[in-house]
Amino acid sequence: MMDMVGYGQNGYYVQGGVNEDGSSSPERIAAVDANVENLAKFREYANSKGVAAGLWTESNLVPDSDNQTYWHLLRDFRKEVSVGGATTLKTDVAWVGPGYSFQLNGVKTAYDIITTAEQFRPNIISLDGWAGSQRFNSVWSGDQTGGNWEYIRFHIPTYIGSSLSGNPNIGSDMDGIFGGKALIAARDYQWKSFTPQMLNMDGWGTYMKAPYTFGDPYTGINRMYMKIKSQLMPYIYTTAVSASNMDTGNDDTGLPIVRAMFLEYPEDAYAYSRTMQYQFCLEQYFSCTSL
């Protein structure tokens, strides 16, 4: 289980502290360090409850040189990883930034810090995605209203389309971020158990976004499918390696995790019209997921 948090409690609405060369004053850095210590304490508490802590950011990954930036918004991702213990990063709206290069440089920096400096397995989620993004981050489709069948209907071809576009690392909110309904949420857990990534985005919906919100029978259904997802993880990891264009010996190098039917059955004309059906993972182990 992963909890995405913000943690800036020091330096509220304090500005300045930027030297002529663009570096930060000791006081400015001290505010960042104090916030990282708060993160470390939260991470320790979360870990004791079986929850890993990640970070949701709309900021640069290092303290910027803008005198107008409030200190509580400053970041030092290297310290957040090495001291705070964060290994997951979700980049949000401000990461559209100047455009293409801003997002790619940001997620690559995060990837390098987590993997090279700290030697952890990274989990980087971004709402931005262009050619090259698939090397470092998954792409999240979210901020929609759940509680209706249309939410499921348009996400199935979205996943297929993203996979065909070269980014197999796709996920979205469970039953949306707004609204919510027990039956729709259960169906969303069912089909998304056969997708690369699942996210609960809580705090804006009519109901809490969690697999146990509505009680049984929905909790039992969600639990069963999440257990299936856990059992499938070795296959999903293997297929993810294949999707990154590496040979796993399964004769599927370069194929995505969510596969349009015509990728598996190119000689079948009918397969080209199946916009609501896809092949998941390894053909020899799994039949088609038909939705």
Give residue spans per PLM region.
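Catalytic-domain carbohydrate-binding cleft regions of carbohydrate-active enzymes
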Residues: 1-291
